[in-house]
């Protein structure tokens, strides 16, 4: 009976917190603001997306993943924030782009600025890989992944295409499918077929699921191709920690049990 009352109490707290969060959550308005938030989201497990290198602040530990610079050691050691769906893909067909390129779109087209700052589309990347990939699309390539040492990213400059390592192909696909739906981007039947195949072939990882929840707490929504998110969880941990710290004995045990039951709902 007591446990049920505690669960009911926690449910009320969760709904109150969720209601407040739904009002307070505001997606970043600029790419610069989005990059600052992205750094915080990825700080607990800092790995570059395409190569799996560890990094600290803006410096990449190339030895941690056996990365060998292809051409530019200086840029290779620098961390950059990469749009998986390139800004060019998002904006090049818009009127603002035709008038003045990306900068003009950022300053004058709110729809483009929102897509440019979407945290679901931002990943940490080695600067050289980011530059080499440019605005190339993704696809399968018949080439040995040896351009960057043990990093298994492949860039074919002649074909203007890149092939990500297997570990992130599913994530790439789900980001592309999400961005296409969210911002009504054009996608060829061939690309859709590829991304749907990758989505099926490479299931969502726990890391990807966790990131989706964290990003949702900053954006106000998740990537549905990754899975459901609980906005009520955003900031709820801090509330519960305070309650648990202030409780003692049997009450503390009851709160823990009730929280577990609530999280399973």
Spans of features found by a protein language model:
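N-terminal Sec-pathway targeting helices
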Residues: 1-9
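Hydrophobic membrane-insertion alpha-helices, especially the h-region
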Residues: 8-20
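Domain-level detector of nuclease and nuclease-like folds
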Residues: 68-80, 85-265
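Aromatic-lined ligand-binding clefts that engage carbohydrates, nucleic acids, or primary amines
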Residues: 21-78, 195, 215
